[in-house]
């Protein structure tokens, strides 16, 4: 059983927020009493307990008023913390802490829980967790062992909600439904009903699904058989393909070798032709070069190379020209670099000039500021500018001294005013201390006066009470005698031994019923254990019936078809034999068809090959004709070529003549010019006059001028014709090939193509005939195969039926010894009857035990009453002896009060003149502070003005000094000198560029003159090189002819044709086999895809699992019906039993507590809700509290007084706590004496003591009573169950304090 041990409170309502204000309360067992005046904070403790256990703030506050208000704390955020130490239902220690923060936002406050910590002891040490608030609440409910509704409405019920048992009907119903958890159980029943309806619907759905799953299962078996057949055919086809490929591979290798050799032959032929053409071209080029040369060198190669090397001075000239060009480039780069440096120097010079101008401006500004400040500070010697360094330093020193004087003056003013202010403050403090002392004296004496008044009232009250004590003493003697007599009569009338014997007999009967219930539980467990076996057996029987029906349907479906093929209904073996023979016929026909198809494909391939070859030959012929026409311009190639050769020869001679004319004319002109008496160089005749000589020379020179142009034109024409000749020579082999194509190759291909087309028509007719025959055979085979699948399935079903029979026999063996006539429902009904009998016996035992306990309690109550009366008699006797002492205290207190009143009046008269004097001094102090502030501000402004001007002067002085220290003036002069020097160097560089340019022009002229002679030597070198290359070409041609003669070209071509024919045959077979294989693979893929479809993939497994699910679901629906009825009956029974127990406790507590005669007892009546239909199946109740007067019962709400209402609510809470708090012995009563008269308060105290006494055997029982009625506390304190109580009061800071007090001190406090 759980219990609470200790709690600390800080920052909640009136409990302070500082650590010193933290209050700790330890809860006693079995009774904890909290007493204090209204507003002291008693109910706050109940609110804290409720918040710690449920997480709920007090109603209507949302936590905003639960925490110490931020305005009272003068803070924006206020934190509150509550710690609770308890033991859970297992007796384990648990510490819980919750922290709250309240934040002021404008006029409103916001409060929330910021931290939750729960600490447990695990593995010998504390373990702390920080769960969320909702998880924390669940942890607390689990630790305490009671629901949240019981914590809120029974255990920790707030004073404002304590009368909820007499609230209006809807609210009362809600409270009791929460306590009984009616809503939760009703929802459980609704959930059971919903689950059952859902499962009913599921069974219907399962039946529909099973129908389709069964069809899918059968279809999947059919597809699987077809797949296996096609896979076997595919395996055979793959083996055929491998065999053909193994024959093709060596053929391909050999053909590739031959083809490479043939390509090599063609390449050699092309290379030989190219070499021959190149040889002719080279010979012609050499001839042309010799004709073009003026003189062919007759010496050796060494002599020619030596002469050519002697011409190297041209190279030297060119090298020198390149050197001059590089010097020119360097001079240009140097000129560009000097120009860039000149530009950079000009930019630097501009910056330096700008800095010099700024330097002069800074000097003028600084001197102006110095002169102005000197006039302001009345300093002499600074009238004339500019100032030198010495004057500037002297000025700064003088200004510093004058500045220190001004600051010293300002500080002097500040010290004088501070001294006067301190003296004024001392006077104020003296008068304030005197005034405060008088006020404190008045406060203390007023407090003492108030306390004395209270003591005086108490003394007078005690004296008044003692006036009737003698009569009360007499009454106590009479009542004590009556109670002792009643106790003696009750002890004689009790028959306790007989009651105990009957209880023992009933307990024996209860043990026997317990044994019967356990036996039924074992039988129920045995039946449940074999439920699955019985289900499996039923499913197997259903499966057997289904398979029998499938076999019958298959026979009726294929009977006509099979009889038409075989004249009887065959078995699987007979049908497979027939199919085998039919497939042999199909294979033979297919082989024949394949052979014909192969021949047809080969013929078609030959036809296509010949067609393509014909097309290529025709295209090649047209291409050759087009090329010949493009080059020749006509189809007469030979005549065009002869004409072209004649033109080339004529042009070559003309070119040679023009080339020689230049040398001849030059020699003639030289001869005619140099000789004194020249003669004609041709006819050797002398010229009659110089004029004729000159005419001849002029004529030769004019012709000589025309020779270069004519020579160039002749060379161009010769090159053009040579190029055309080369193109025509290249076309000569093409011309021969064109003739062969037209006259031989194309007519032969056309004849072969016509013969092959006739063969193709014959083969097509044969293929069509074989294909129609295959269609007939395949149709018969397909019909037989369609039947074969079902026949195989029939035989499989027959085998499965044998397995099913064996399984049925196996399950029947397992169920031997099990009473199949007793069902789970029968055993469950018998178990319910035994439980009902057991409950009746248990209630009878409990009734007898309660009766026995009541008699024992009655005796104990009478004994307790005798003890109480005796104690009260002794107490009254003691009080009578204290009367003289109380009268003396009355006189003493009256005298002290009179003296205190006079002293307070005198102190108040002394306070008034001190207040006026204090006010006057404070006004004088304020005026002094204003003058002090004004004077100091004026002096400070003067100092700041001087500092600002000095700062500006220092800044300009710093810039001036920096310019001088950096040497900017010298740097400026240096850059100007560098600029002049750079200008001189730039002019020198330009002069050098002019000189180099003149030398380069001279060298170029010399080089052009020498290149003509060098060209002649170069032509001789080229001719000799070409002759050497021609020899190499002839040797290479001879080598290729020799290599080509070693290869057997004709034999290779024949072998290539034979191997090609064989390869085409194998390729045709390979294509046909691959085609069939592709068909098999497509069918296999189609079958596999069908099997991989969701409806076929696991069709049989899904069918079996769905059947199991449907059967088990049907059984579960039956169990749900049983459980629903059982649970509904259990809820009704639980509710009625608990209400009987609650009403019994209420009746006993009312009779023992209520002292009036108008109400015999009260009880809670629960009635089913008439507004709920029977179809809804929800058990709901309406509750009302009634009071019994004779034979009449009335609703207590509206018919009872305020005191009766409080007492009834309290008793109902006590009864609910007795019933629902078996795991938690805590109960808190907040102001239970509200609206009760004195007699009912006494009886309530007596009832609580009796409850404590009856529950004292429970080690963790705790009753917490909060009250302001100290008489009620005193009555509870008379019992032996309480030694200390807590007094709640507020301290001087108006913060709540919890003080532990002894019960023995309560009497002295009261009296």
Curated annotation (Swiss-Prot):
EC primary class: hydrolase
Q: Which cofactor names does the annotation list?
A: Zn(2+)
One short Pfam name that applies is SbcC_Walker_B
GO molecular function term, any single one = G-quadruplex DNA binding
* Annotated Zinc-hook domain residues: 634-733
Q: Name one GO cellular component term.
A: condensed nuclear chromosome
Reactions listed under catalytic activity: ATP + H2O = ADP + phosphate + H(+)
Q: Give the keywords, sorted.
A: ATP-binding, Chromosome, Coiled coil, DNA damage, DNA repair, Hydrolase, Magnesium, Meiosis, Metal-binding, Nucleotide-binding, Nucleus, Telomere, Zinc
Q: Which residues bind Mg(2+)?
A: 43, 159
Positions binding Zn(2+) in this chain are 680, 683
This chain belongs to which protein, by name?
A: DNA repair protein RAD50.S
Q: Which organism is it from?
A: Xenopus laevis (African clawed frog)
């Amino acid at each position: 059983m759980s219990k609470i041990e200790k709690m600390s409170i800080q920052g909640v309502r009136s409990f302070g927020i500082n650590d010193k204000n933290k209050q700790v309360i330890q809860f006693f067992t079995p009774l904890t009493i909290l007493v204090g005046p209204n507003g002291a904070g008693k109910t706050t403790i109940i609110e804290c307990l409720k918040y710690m256990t449920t997480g709920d703030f007090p109603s209507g506050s949302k936590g905003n008023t639960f925490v110490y208000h931020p305005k009272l704390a003068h803070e924006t955020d206020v934190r509150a913390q509550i710690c609770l130490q308890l033991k859970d239902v297992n007796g384990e220690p648990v510490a819980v802490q919750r922290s709250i923060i309240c934040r002021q936002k404008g006029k409103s406050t916001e409060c929330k829980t910021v931290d939750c910590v729960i600490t447990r002891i695990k593995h010998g040490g504390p373990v702390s967790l920080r769960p969320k608030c909702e998880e924390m609440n669940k942890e607390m409910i689990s630790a305490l062992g009671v629901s949240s509704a019981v914590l809120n409405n029974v255990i920790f019920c707030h004073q404002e909600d304590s009368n909820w048992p007499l609230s209006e009907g809807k609210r009362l119903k809600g409270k009791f439904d929460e306590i009984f958890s009616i809503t939760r159980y009703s929802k459980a029943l609704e959930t059971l009903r919903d689950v059952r309806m859902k499962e009913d619907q599921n069974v219907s759905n399962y039946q529909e699904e099973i129908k389709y799953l069964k069809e899918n299962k059968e279809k999947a078996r059919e597809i699987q058989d077809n797949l296996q057949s096609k896979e076997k055919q595919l395996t055979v086809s793959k083996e055929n393909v491998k065999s053909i490929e193994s024959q093709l591979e060596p053929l391909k290798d050999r053909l590739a070798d031959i083809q490479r050799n043939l390509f090599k032959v063609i390449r050699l032929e092309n290379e030989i032709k190219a070499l021959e053409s190149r040889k002719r071209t080279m010979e012609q080029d050499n001839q042309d070069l010799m004709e073009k040369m003026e003189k062919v060198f007759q010496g050796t190669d060494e002599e020619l190379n030596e002469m050519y090397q002697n011409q190297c001075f041209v190279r030297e000239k060119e090298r020198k020209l390149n050197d001059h060009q590089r010097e020119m480039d360097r001079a240009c780069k140097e000129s560009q670099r000097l120009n860039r440096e000149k530009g950079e120097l000009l930019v630097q010079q501009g910056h330096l000039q700008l800095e010099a101008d700024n330097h002069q401006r800074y000097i003028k500004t600084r001197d102006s500021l110095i002169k102005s400040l000197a006039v302001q500070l009345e300093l002499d010697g600074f009238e004339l500018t500019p100032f030198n360094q010495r004057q500037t330093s002297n000025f700064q020193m003088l200004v510093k001294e004058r500045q220190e004087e001004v600051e010293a003056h300002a500080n002097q003013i500040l010290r004088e005013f501070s001294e006067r202010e301190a003296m004024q403050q001392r006077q104020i403090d003296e008068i304030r201390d005197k005034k405060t002392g008088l006020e404190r004296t008045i406060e203390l004496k007023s407090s003492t006066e108030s306390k004395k008044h209270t003591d005086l009232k108490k003394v007078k009250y005690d004296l008044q009470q003692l006036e009737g004590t003698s009569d009360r003493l007499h009454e106590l003697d009479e009542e004590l005698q009556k109670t002792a007599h009643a106790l003696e009569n009750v002890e004689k009338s009790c028959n306790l031994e007989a009651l105990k014997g009957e209880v023992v007999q009933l307990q024996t009967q209860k043990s026997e019923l317990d044994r019967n219930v356990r036996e039924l539980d074992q039988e129920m467990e045995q039946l449940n254990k074999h439920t699955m076996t019985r289900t499996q057996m039923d499913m197997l029987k259903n499966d057997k019936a289904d398979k029998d029906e499938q076999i019958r349907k298959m026979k009726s479906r294929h009977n006509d078809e099979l009889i038409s093929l075989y004249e009887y209904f065959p078995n699987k073996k007979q049908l497979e034999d027939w199919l085998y023979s039919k497939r042999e016929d199909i294979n033979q026909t297919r082989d024949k068809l394949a052979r014909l198809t192969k021949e047809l494909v080969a013929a078609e391939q030959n036809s296509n090959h010949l067609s393509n070859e014909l097309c290529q030959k025709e295209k090649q012929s047209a291409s050759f004709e087009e090329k010949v026409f493009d080059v020749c311009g006509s189809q007469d190639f030979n005549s065009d070529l002869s004409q072209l050769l004649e033109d080339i020869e004529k042009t070559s001679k003309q070119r040679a003549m023009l080339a020689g004319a230049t040398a001849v004319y030059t020699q003639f002109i030289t001869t005619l010019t140099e000789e004194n008496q020249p003669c004609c160089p041709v006819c050797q005749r002398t010229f009659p006059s110089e004029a004729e000589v000159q005419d001849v020379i002029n004529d030769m020179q004019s012709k000589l001028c025309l020779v270069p142009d004519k020579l160039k034109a002749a060379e161009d024409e010769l090159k053009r014709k040579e190029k055309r000749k080369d193109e025509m020579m290249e076309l000569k082999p093409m011309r021969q090939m064109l003739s062969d194509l037209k006259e031989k190759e194309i007519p032969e291909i056309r004849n072969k193509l016509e013969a092959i087309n006739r063969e193709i028509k014959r083969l097509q007719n044969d293929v069509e005939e074989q294909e129609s025959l295959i269609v007939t055979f395949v149709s018969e085979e397909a019909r037989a195969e369609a039947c074969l699948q079902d026949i195989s399935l029939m035989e499989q079903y027959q085998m499965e039926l044998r397995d099913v029979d064996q399984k049925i026999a196996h399950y029947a063996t397992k169920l031997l010894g099990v009473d199949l006539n007793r069902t789970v429902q029968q055993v469950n009904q018998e178990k319910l009857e035994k439980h009902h009998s057991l409950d009746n016996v248990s209630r009878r035992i409990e009734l007898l035990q309660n009766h026995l306990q009541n008699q024992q309690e009655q005796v104990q109550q009478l004994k307790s009453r005798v003890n109480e009366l005796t104690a009260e008699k002794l107490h009254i006797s003691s009080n009578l002896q204290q009367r003289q002492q109380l009268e003396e205290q009355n006189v003493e207190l009256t005298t002290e009060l009179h003296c205190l009143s006079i002293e307070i009046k005198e102190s108040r008269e002394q306070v008034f003149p001190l207040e006026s004097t204090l006010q006057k001094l404070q006004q004088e102090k304020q005026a002094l502070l204003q003058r002090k502030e004004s004077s100091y501000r004026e002096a400070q402004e003067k100092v700041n003005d001087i500092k600002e001007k000095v700062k500006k002067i220092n800044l300009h002085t710093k810039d001036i000094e920096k310019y001088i220290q950096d040497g900017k003036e010298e740097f400026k002069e240096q850059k100007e000198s560098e600029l002049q020097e750079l200008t001189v160097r730039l002019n020198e560089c330009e002069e050098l560029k002019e000189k180099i340019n003149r030398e380069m022009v001279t060298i170029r002229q010399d080089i052009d003159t020498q290149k003509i002679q060098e060209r002649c030597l170069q032509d001789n070198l080229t001719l000799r090189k070409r002759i050497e290359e021609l020899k190499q070409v002839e040797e290479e041609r001879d080598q290729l002819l020799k290599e080509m003669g070693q290869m057997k070209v004709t034999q290779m071509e024949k072998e290539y044709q034979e191997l090609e024919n064989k390869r085409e045959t194998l390729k045709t077979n390979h294509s046909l086999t691959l085609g069939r294989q592709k068909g098999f693979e497509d069918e296999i893929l189609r079958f596999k895809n069908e099997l991989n479809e969701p409806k076929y993939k696991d069709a049989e497994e899904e069918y079996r699992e769905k059947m199991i699910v449907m059967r088990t679901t049907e059984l579960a629906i039956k169990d749900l019906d049983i459980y629903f009825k059982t649970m509904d009956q259990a809820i009704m029974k639980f509710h009625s039993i608990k209400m009987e127990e609650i009403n019994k406790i209420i009746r006993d507590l009312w009779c023992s507590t209520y002292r009036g005669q108008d109400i015999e007892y009260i009880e809670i009546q629960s009635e089913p809700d008439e507004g709920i239909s029977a179809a809804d199946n929800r058990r709901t109740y309406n509750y009302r509290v009634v009071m019994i007067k004779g034979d009449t019962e009335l609703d207590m709400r509206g018919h009872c007084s305020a005191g009766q209402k409080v007492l009834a609510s309290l008793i109902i809470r006590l009864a609910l706590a007795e019933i629902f708090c078996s795991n938690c012995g805590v109960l808190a009563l907040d102001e239970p004496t509200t609206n009760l008269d004195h007699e009912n308060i006494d009886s309530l105290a007596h009832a609580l003591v009796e409850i404590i006494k009856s529950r004292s055997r429970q080690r963790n029982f705790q009753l917490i009573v909060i009250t302001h009625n100290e008489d009620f506390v005193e009555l509870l304190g008379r019992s032996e169950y309480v030694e200390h109580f807590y007094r709640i009061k507020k301290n001087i800071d108006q913060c709540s304090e919890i003080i532990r007090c002894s019960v023995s001190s309560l009497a002295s406090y009261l009296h």
